[in-house]
Amino acid sequence: ACALLNSQPMGFYQPAQIVSDARNHGVDIRPVDVNHSLWDNTLEEKSGKYCAIRLGFRQVKGLKEDDVNILIQARGEGFRTLHEVRDSGLSESVLERLANADAFRSVRRDRRDALWDVSTKGKIDGMFKSKHHETEADHAIELPAMALSEHVIQDYASTSLSLKAHPVSFVREELSQLRSIPISKLSECKNGMA
């Protein structure tokens, strides 16, 4: 699965299908993260039968390998804050792509907060330049949490897959009311039933 993801685009299996199949076979898939990902998707050790797959930055639409190399060099032992990531020299558009991909979880910033921070921080710093380090007070704005469906939509828009839920899960009840048969039940149907 890891090699298939690194070989994209191939024209047939989409990343979401590869990840879904790997998960169905017991493989742990870990998200893109500023502190853990490399350009390529990689295998990580874990207890159990299989290695885990860490999604690489190549999964994030619009990122360039050169930008990722800057990030990887700058992170050293790891970023502790989003402020440190911003100071790495990445452009605002790269930071926004990373935020859209929800890649700041290890620095305790969820997608919406990270998007807010990377899209406003530079503009605010330019107007009110100060030399203080990032503090909790810098994050006093309480943004509403994103709904799971919003996360999934944004995951697909930014990485072509979601580790949070399948898009059909949000309409499963309506499909059941329409008497649609889930694909997992098709093998139980007799000819002419479906």
Where are the predicted features?
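Noncatalytic, beta-rich nucleic-acid-contacting surfaces in large DNA/RNA-processing enzymes
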Residues: A1-A194
